[in-house]
Amino acid sequence: MKDVNEEERIIGAESSEEDETIELSLRPQLLAQYIGQDKVKSEMKIYIKAAKQRDEALDHVLLYGPPGLGKTTLAFVIANEMGVHLKSTSGPAIEKAGDLVALLSELNPGDVLFIDEIHRLAKPVEEVLYSAMEDFYIDIVVGEGQTTHAVHVPLPPFTLIGATTRAGQLSAPLRDRFGIIEHMQYYSVEDLEKIIQRSSVVFNTKIDPEAAIELARRSRGTPRVANRLLKRVRDFAEVKGEEAISLVTTKHSLHLLEVDDEGLDQTDRKLLRMMIENYGGGPVGIKTIAANVGEDTDTIEEVYEPYLLQKGFITRTPRGRSVTQKAYLQLGYPPKDEK
């Protein structure tokens, strides 16, 4: 079944180099410009204002939720609102403790260190963070053999912003050192429509309101997907010579791209069909699903499942995953209890 990887999926929420370029051009600078995530924004606004009034570094922030929801963008906005510099890296990029020490030593008072995929930090690297986050110091081991000794290095107060799609994989000692923990939710159709309209201005194109709504409905609650689909639909509209992207062109384009009215693509439908046709709709164990899809279990849980769960196409049970009646109807199967 494995014929389309996450980076190739038009509705895949994982970031590509093209996505990063697009998102950089679309990135808001202030919380007031950041569309959606109202609860997170209102709380962060208070925390930022309080920290600035006390002339202190903002407390450490953990942002978690599915990919493509704007965690990196929000980190940059937070740093900008605080009036400080942000240094960006990722968990896999920090291979050893020395790499983290080098990053920390470059920070000025109040600066933000942003670590994406923080759940993928190596254990020795994570342990260096403990004292850095809690007491703003690190111990560096220098010398060899009998001359080995630890050097106590103070750090300026800084803010660590960690982003993760797998909050459950963070160790308790690391998670407990974050004073602010925010859950990023899937976006509403209304917020996605606003994002699409805003992005169309940046892309120097026009889109009819009803077309923007249709695009928002199929964007899986994810701004990254919405912007990617907007670019592709824009291509179809320009080839047709439309001055503004129409609803007809939007529907036709998404049909050709195999994105249905619920935002499911060919890969989603194959996964659901496999569960229905091979296992009677479930329950199916996660390892069995992974073997059929040709992915590891982490990819299933992180990439495929979140949207299917959120939209009610599958459920989790103690014995595995089951397909819902909604999925049967969406794929044109008779309801399960009628079979």
From Swiss-Prot:
Signal peptide: none annotated. It is an enzyme of class 3 (hydrolase). Residues 188-258 are annotated as: Small ATPAse domain (RuvB-S). Keywords: ATP-binding, Cytoplasm, DNA damage, DNA recombination, DNA repair, DNA-binding, Hydrolase, Nucleotide-binding. Mg(2+) binds at residue 72. It catalyses: ATP + H2O = ADP + phosphate + H(+). It is found in: Cytoplasm. Its main location: cytoplasm. One of its GO terms (cellular component) is cytoplasm. It holds the Pfam family RuvB_C. Residues 261-339 are annotated as: Head domain (RuvB-H). GO terms for molecular function: ATP binding; ATP hydrolysis activity; four-way junction DNA binding; four-way junction helicase activity. Gene3D superfamilies: 1.10.8.60, P-loop containing nucleotide triphosphate hydrolases, Winged helix-like DNA-binding domain superfamily/Winged helix DNA-binding domain. ATP binds at residues 26-27, 68, 71-73, 134-136, 177, 187, 224. DNA binds at residues 316, 321. It comes from the Bacteria. Its EC number is 3.6.4.-. Belongs to the RuvB family. The RuvA-RuvB-RuvC complex processes Holliday junction (HJ) DNA during genetic recombination and DNA repair, while the RuvA-RuvB complex plays an important role in the rescue of blocked DNA replication forks via replication fork reversal (RFR). RuvA specifically binds to HJ cruciform DNA, conferring on it an open structure. The RuvB hexamer acts as an ATP-dependent pump, pulling dsDNA into and through the RuvAB complex. RuvB forms 2 homohexamers on either side of HJ DNA bound by 1 or 2 RuvA tetramers; 4 subunits per hexamer contact DNA at a time. Homohexamer. Forms an RuvA(8)-RuvB(12)-Holliday junction (HJ) complex. HJ DNA is sandwiched between 2 RuvA tetramers; dsDNA enters through RuvA and exits via RuvB. An RuvB hexamer assembles on each DNA strand where it exits the tetramer. Each RuvB hexamer is contacted by two RuvA subunits (via domain III) on 2 adjacent RuvB subunits; this complex drives branch migration. In the full resolvosome a probable DNA-RuvA(4)-RuvB(12)-RuvC(2) complex forms which resolves the HJ. This is Holliday junction branch migration complex subunit RuvB. It comes from Lactobacillus johnsonii (strain CNCM I-12250 / La1 / NCC 533).
